[in-house]
Structure formats: C-alpha cells, structure tokens
C-alpha cells in the first residue's frame, strides 16, 4: 500500500496566488510511504499569471530490497489551464523501465491525444525528446474531462478523468467516506475522505479550502 501525505501546506502569499481564491501557494510536496518506509516524493509547482496556470508534477519512487533497488518509478508532467478550463498536458513516465509519453491539447470540441505506440520499447533518446510523428498514435477524448493529477478538488465530482500516464479515459465512481484529521510535518488538518472505484482505485483527502492533503493507493 502506497500513501502520499502532504509535508507542508500553505496558501499563496502573493497577489497572483491569492487571486480567484486559488487554494495553493507556489508548491506542494508529499512524502511517499510504503509499509512504513519513505520511498520517494511527489512534488507539484504552480505558476500563475492572471487566468493562466501552469502545474508541474515531479514523482520519484524507489523500492529497495536488501539495499538493492527492486522497483523504480519516475513521472514528469506539465499541464496548462485558462481559468477553470483545462488546456493541455504533456507527460513522460518511466514505470520500472516501461517508458511512456503523452501529449493532450484542447482542439475545438474535443481533446486531442497523442501517445507513443510501443511503450515497452521506447528508446531513451525518444523518451528524452518526447513524442515523434513516426511512433505515436492519436485519439480524442471528450472536452470536459479533467486530468487525474490529484490536486484539483473538482475531480471528486467527475464520472471520468484523464489517466495522466496513459492518456486514456478512466471511468470512476467517487463516494464520500467522511471527515478525518490528517497530520502533516507541522500541523493537523481536518479533511474529507473520498473513495474512487472503477478504472482508478484510491482514497483521497481534501481539506475545507479544497487543497489536496493525502492519497492512499
């Protein structure tokens, strides 16, 4: 079982982050814990300019057995928003050697998706430079879908999300489990716990300001 718990939670101190009641500061960091051991981190950075928002995600996990790394996971993503409207996403993932890359952008009445066709044989060079026209497949998704990148509390009210690793549509059912107190490195936070079932299975906690504070897979 993998648990992500926020290390430090603060609202923005500048006008850019305070505008439109945006609930986060410039960054958000989580410790990733498995069986009581910290195995990595999940970090987000938020860059806001007027109605424009860029969210960058960095995930690094490593599970070790007797001092040897038995499993490694890396994920990098950048998503762009205009107000409440999702505009685009670019993501690359290395899931213990299985490398994938996706790009999603708003295109008229749909979301246009590109992803590499053969993730298990994507070369390091291609992985580093992203998708190329000769090794990608293209699909479309409904325009109202949101990324499954955890930070946006609106995702608990959705019937489907975009899997940010594969670019596929993930159908979900989300139920409210109740209120709990989450301990961070410097505080305790009252939060609501949500349970996802369907194509995504996890529990997620948001505080009263709509800030993501914990996830359990």
Q: Which residues are covered by each model-predicted region?
A:
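Bacterial N-terminal signal peptides
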Residues: 3-13
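Boundary at the C-terminal end of the N-terminal hydrophobic targeting segment
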Residues: 15-20
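N-terminal mature ectodomain segment of secretory-pathway/periplasmic proteins
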Residues: 22-113, 210, 215-217
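Short, exposed beta-strand-loop hairpins at the edges of beta-sheets
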Residues: 196, 202-207, 211-217
């Amino acid at each position: 079982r993998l648990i992500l718990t926020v290390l430090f939670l603060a609202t923005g101190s500048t006008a850019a982050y305070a505008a439109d009641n945006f609930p986060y500061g410039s960054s958000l960091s989580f410790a990733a814990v498995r069986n009581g051991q910290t195995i990595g981190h999940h970090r987000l950075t938020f860059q806001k300019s007027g109605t424009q928002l860029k969210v960058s995600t960095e995930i690094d996990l490593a599970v070790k057995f007797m001092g040897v790394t038995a499993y490694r996971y890396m994920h990098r993503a950048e998503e762009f928003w205009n107000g409440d409207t999702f505009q685009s996403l670019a993501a690359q993932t290395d899931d213990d050697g299985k490398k994938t890359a996706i790009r999603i952008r708003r295109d008229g009445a749909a979301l246009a998706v590109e992803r590499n066709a053969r993730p298990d044989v994507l070369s390091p060079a291609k992985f580093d430079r992203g998708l190329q026209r000769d090794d990608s497949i293209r699909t479309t998704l409904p325009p109202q879908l949101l990324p499954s990148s955890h930070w946006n509390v609106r995702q608990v009210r959705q019937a489907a999300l975009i899997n940010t690793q594969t670019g596929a549509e993930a159908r979900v059912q989300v139920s409210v489990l109740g209120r709990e107190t989450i301990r961070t490195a410097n505080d305790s936070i009252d939060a609501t716990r949500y349970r996802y079932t369907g194509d995504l299975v996890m529990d997620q906690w948001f505080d009263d300001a709509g800030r993501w504070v914990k996830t359990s897979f």
